[in-house]
Amino acid sequence: MLAPGMGEWVYKANLFLFGEFGYYYPFSLLILNYLYYKKKYKIENFKRRELFGFSLAFFSTLLLFSVFYREFGYILEIVYGFFSIILGRTGSGIFALLLLLFSLVLLFPKFAKEILKIELDFTYLLKVEQAFKSLLMRVFGGENEKEDVGKSEPIAPKLNILQDSIYGNLQINKKGETNNLEQIIKDSNINASKNSITTAKENFEKLKNQILDETIEIDKQSLKESRSFVHEHSQQVRNFAQKASKMSISLDEDFNFISEEEVDMIPERFLKPKKLEDIKQIDTNKNLDEPSYKRKNIEIPVSNQEVKPKIFTKELELRENLIKKEKLEQEYKAYQNEILENKVKQEIKKLEEYDAINSSDIIEGNKYSFNSPKTIKAETEESDKINENKNLDKADNIFEFAPIVEELNHPYIEPTPIKNINEIVIEEKNTLDFIQNTETKIDNEKTNDQEIKLQKAVLAKEIAINQALLREIEQGEVEKPKDFTLPPLDFLANPKEHKQEINESEIDKKIYNLLEKLRRFKIGGDVISTYVGPVVTTFEFRPSADVKVSRILNLQDDLTMALMAKSIRIQAPIPGKDVVGIEVPNDEIQTIYLREILQSEVFKNAKSPLTIALGKDIVGNAFVTDLKKLPHLLIAGTTGSGKSVGINSMLLSLLYRNSPKTLRLMMIDPKMLEFSIYNDIPHLLTPVITDPKKAVNALSNMVAEMERRYRLMADAKTKNIENYNEKMKELGGEELPFIVVIIDELADLMMTAGKDVEFYIGRLAQMARASGIHLIVATQRPSVDVVTGLIKANLPSRISYKVGQKIDSKVILDAMGAESLLGRGDCLFTPPGTSSIVRLHAPFASEFEIEKIVDFLKDQQSVEYDESFLKDQQSVGVTTNESFDGEVDELYEEAKRVILEDGKTSISYLQRRLKIGYNRSANIIEQLTQNGILSEPDAKGQREIL
């Protein structure tokens, strides 16, 4: 009951005193409470202008409320009554507003300066305040207290500013006192006579000097007060004074000159010890381990004991332990040597006694032979001398025959070849000399040997990766044709005998630039090996354990700039290794000739007739592959990338191993320029096809040929064309040749007859391998609409020359890198069944060389084309219907039902639905047209259902 009643009483008292102002001023208390919290609940932390500003703001607000609500509060009535008498109501309001503005300027001086363009001179306000105080002191009496002006900024004051303010205040006081003194003297001398003027002046000078002396004492006293004020209110200045006082103390054993105040001020840990033993202990234990501001700058008498530095304590302890361990090992080896020597001497003595008893030179069944006791003694003396001259560190090499001597204590074993001690001692000398010589040689050539071994190991490892692919090729001799002469290698140009000179300084410079650029991006590691090839130089960089491989891949452009290269390729990581391969083009690129590849042992020893030459790897070794194991090849590359050169090399390598009876070629060249040089060679199955419609017919007929071969092999009960041909040799039947279909530009065919071409290529790629039909498909634009998912899935082996974009490389290789190739035959090859990518450089064969080979083949045998592959299937269907004389196909009714139900009239659709050949499907469509079910084909080749 007390609390509610008291609250109501306070509420009424508040309304009685302040009226309407009582509803608003409590909110200002919230602001004051927050500011009081920020000042750490100390009124001393408030600046004087802030206190004046708060007070004036409160008073001006109270005055404004008294002007408007003078009848609602007792205090408001009193304030309004006082100011209305002096200023009136309007004047009181204006005065309150000006006072409120002045309080805001005091509280926010920077805001007032920037916005209101009002700036107060606080020194002038101090003078006004001092004058007002002196006036009050004169009126009401009392001493004129000199306030410490520095109190306006009590938090961490600066000593110089504080002193300046003190001296300024003192100068003001001096001037005020001298003015007062002059006024008193003038008042006292009004009634004086002219004779007393001189005495008054003397008295004035004495009083002035006395006042000056008092002011000097006041200056010193005020300075001490200011210092005490600084130490009391500033933690930073106190810490600085403590550290500075420590530095001012000099070495004195008694330390009697330090005042008690300074001793109390300095912490105990900063005081110097008074005993010499304590000083030594600090020097040995703490002086080197502690920070510099804790060290004692004193001179310590040098002791005889060596003071070990504590900075590398762990390293020194580890080193001492290693030295002790090494000494123990040496002592142990010396002790073991002494034991072995004693055992040998004892065994020799036993042998001497045994020899003296038996008096025979050679003991049967023993392992040693002795000439006489004299020779034994001489030999033992020689062995003792040798043992004395030997170093104890080489204990492992001393007395290698000692274990053999120990076997004398064992029972008799099978006889072994007899050895003389002379031979043993001589062998021991020779081994020691040999070991010493080899050790010196190894020490002198250690680094060179390591580099050579490392280089050979890395080179062998790189060759092993490529040879793992080459070993998959079947080795053997190729069966030479009997009635056909293969072209000689003389038609091909010889490679230049100029050997590539390895510029080691240039390679070292590239390694330095590479590592320096990587370190700039905080990537640590080292180049562990370097391969110099005909086109590129490969650096194997082993990154640190904390480096992500993706960071190195993202720096490809930066590394290209650092190495000043045209383009580089980063293989991260190299399969089977813990390194990243960085391939940089050489300054001088060598030309690789086709003759080099065809003369290589790898190509000669390959048994397969479909071995094709792909070029050289990054080391410079020849690289070939078997088309039967690919079994189809997809090639991509922009104009000028060397794609046509690579295809020509593959074709020539096939022509150098096969006669027209074992190999037939079908070339589709929509550009009409690439394969025109091969026209009329005996290996061609058809003329070079340049018309897209004929190309579709040729592919459809090739599918029919594939089906025909499968039926033949099924009748012969064989699984592939090799077994079928062997069986035909035994039976005297006709052998089937290999057929290689080469399409130079797939994109043009996909634009004219995309679905049909995709279907036929898919059929051939899926099933034609066993029948001896292989595809080599090339395109300049490996986009998704050209290299569709069906084609890409059925052509696992791919070669990519330089492409224009990263996405093209991703489409053809499923990996980046082809966009960074150099062109001119530089390519990436993906073997089937592996995820590794092999970088190759295609060989070059000029048009003049190709012409000589083509002419040589033409002169031996004329070409025999199979025109049935190029016939239009629709015309074939008409002729077959006429020849049938009204005979209807067995699937006629079913085909009619499919077309009427599905509404599709294309030959390829009917072929897929009925799973028949293209020719039969075309015949059925023609029969439906003749019977009036389908219309004739329009300009686009489409038919309508009638």
Swiss-Prot record:
The chain crosses the membrane at residues 15-35, 67-87, 92-112. GO terms for biological process: cell division; chromosome segregation. GO terms for molecular function: ATP binding; DNA binding. It is found in: Cell inner membrane. ATP binds at G640, S641, G642, K643, S644, V645. It is a multi-pass membrane protein. Signal peptide: none annotated. Pfam families: FtsK_alpha, FtsK_gamma, FtsK_SpoIIIE. CDD domains: TrwB_TraG_TraD_VirD4. One of its GO terms (cellular component) is plasma membrane. InterPro entries: FtsK/SpoIIIE/SftA (IPR050206), FtsK_alpha (IPR041027), FtsK_dom (IPR002543), Ftsk_gamma (IPR018541), P-loop_NTPase (IPR027417), WH-like_DNA-bd_sf (IPR036388), WH_DNA-bd_sf (IPR036390). Residues 113-946 are cytoplasmic. SMART domains: Ftsk_gamma. Residues 620-810 form the FtsK domain. Keywords: ATP-binding, Cell cycle, Cell division, Cell inner membrane, Cell membrane, Chromosome partition, DNA-binding, Membrane, Nucleotide-binding, Transmembrane, Transmembrane helix. Homohexamer. Forms a ring that surrounds DNA. Belongs to the FtsK/SpoIIIE/SftA family. Consists of an N-terminal domain, which is sufficient for the localization to the septal ring and is required for cell division, followed by a linker domain, and a C-terminal domain, which forms the translocation motor involved in chromosome segregation. The C-terminal domain can be further subdivided into alpha, beta and gamma subdomains. The alpha and beta subdomains multimerise to produce a hexameric ring, contain the nucleotide binding motif and form the DNA pump. Essential cell division protein that coordinates cell division and chromosome segregation. The N-terminus is involved in assembly of the cell-division machinery. The C-terminus functions as a DNA motor that moves dsDNA in an ATP-dependent manner towards the dif recombination site, which is located within the replication terminus region. Translocation stops specifically at Xer-dif sites, where FtsK interacts with the Xer recombinase, allowing activation of chromosome unlinking by recombination. FtsK orienting polar sequences (KOPS) guide the direction of DNA translocation. This is DNA translocase FtsK. It comes from Campylobacter jejuni subsp. jejuni serotype O:23/36 (strain 81-176). The lineage of its organism: Bacteria, Pseudomonadati, Campylobacterota, Epsilonproteobacteria, Campylobacterales.
